[in-house]
Amino acid sequence: MASLNKVMLIGNLGRDPEIRYMPSGDAMANLNIATTDTWKDKGGEKQERTEWHRVVMFGKQAEIAGEYLKKGSQIYIEGRLQTRKWTDKSNVERYTTEIVADRMQMLGGRSGGGSYDPPADRDHDYQSQSTPPAKSNTGFDDMEDDIPF
């Protein structure tokens, strides 16, 4: 049987993206995204739980995140979970599980609203351009704004 490693999040940035550059010159962005679940307990009281997610993105997508995203920005992310091993300053091996973003869409307000899908082949450059949204074929674009009621 095949396996699936897919994450989809809609949340808000807890701080501005942290942008770094790898030795190859490619950009890398680290984001902290908060998602909040709400429910009512047995007594009818509203309850909330916020979960924080570490997200990393690379290349042109990382550059776009650094330029347009700020603390509080609402964002949609698609990606996969990945665990990496690293050594801290005390020479202790550590593990971090994070979401590697394959797709990002900025949500809410005029400062967001764009999307970026990276090229399908990750071994090549990240120089593709995002395309503007396709024009709607619903026919509503030609309708007048005067509502008859």
Curated annotation (Swiss-Prot):
Domain SSB: 4-108
Protein name (record): Single-stranded DNA-binding protein
Lineage: Bacteria, Pseudomonadati, Pseudomonadota, Betaproteobacteria, Nitrosomonadales
Motif, Important for interaction with partner proteins: chain positions: 144-149
Keyword field contains DNA damage: yes
Pfam families: SSB
Species whose genome carries this gene: Nitrosomonas europaea (strain ATCC 19718 / CIP 103999 / KCTC 2705 / NBRC 14298)
Originating gene: ssb
Assembly and interaction partners: Homotetramer.
Ranges of Polar residues composition bias in the record: 127-139
Keywords assigned: DNA damage, DNA recombination, DNA repair, DNA replication, DNA-binding
Membrane spanning stretches: none
Gene3D superfamilies: Nucleic acid-binding proteins
GO terms under cellular component: nucleoid
Acyltransferase keyword on record: no
GO biological process: DNA recombination; DNA repair; DNA replication
